[in-house]
Amino acid sequence: MWVEADINRIRFFWNSGPVGMIQHDDFWDLVCQKVNVYRGDVSGTTTNIINLDDGREIPTDILLCGTGWDSTYRFLSSTQKVELGLPHKPCKDSDEERRSWSELVDTADRQILQQYPILGRPPSDCKPIGGAGLTPARLYNGIASLTDSSILFLGRARMSNNFRGAEAQAIWATAYLDGNVTIPPLKQAKREVAYMNAFSRRRYPSRGVDGLNFHTDLVWYTDKLLCEAGMRSHRKGWWEDPDEPCLASDFEDCKEEYMAVYGSKQGR
């Protein structure tokens, strides 16, 4: 098995590399016995050889490419992406819009560095991954367009527990579409979005360039969504909440709570 990796570049605090969950007890035993790690870039392949850019040749029977996924919404026009607040080329913004967002992000950035000075000193090898040349996503809570209340974008934000994140986003989206959540006035909403974008970029300099990385901010993020939806964010009890992991199963009774708060005709 051939694996391209660079363990030295991965730092958990800065989330500079992908993070996974060990699902099997024998995972590391299998890796240490069966996996050879080669660090480098692929320059080409032949019938049964992978060529690296440093001249090494790696015999192989099969090559698996983990190419990621495309979140560019190809079915939307470039104009629609700008209007909805999805990542787009800055040149598509009007001069006034570009200047307004730049001022908001700069203000948020100064506030963040004043409050968290360490974020101004990331490792030199934490380079942005993806999103080069595009604006960040300008979505309230990483979900809602600031200009069109009829559409939401779920699942774009990256979190350390996507199951919990998905549950919280679904609850917030239900309340929003039911009319039980309203986003702040536009000026305030833009300030909050700019802060979220700037924080994502500073906190996660490699993977936060699109403004939607909440990897170690999972609990804050899901608490915010539930509170805005009028639900209880602390659901286990005064002792268990600070002492036990936050899981998707914490929200298992949210449907009943939602109907109790807003009525049985909603939240279906």
At which residue positions do the language-model features occur?
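N-terminal FAD-binding dinucleotide-binding subdomain shared by FAD-dependent oxidases/monooxygenases
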Residues: 1-268
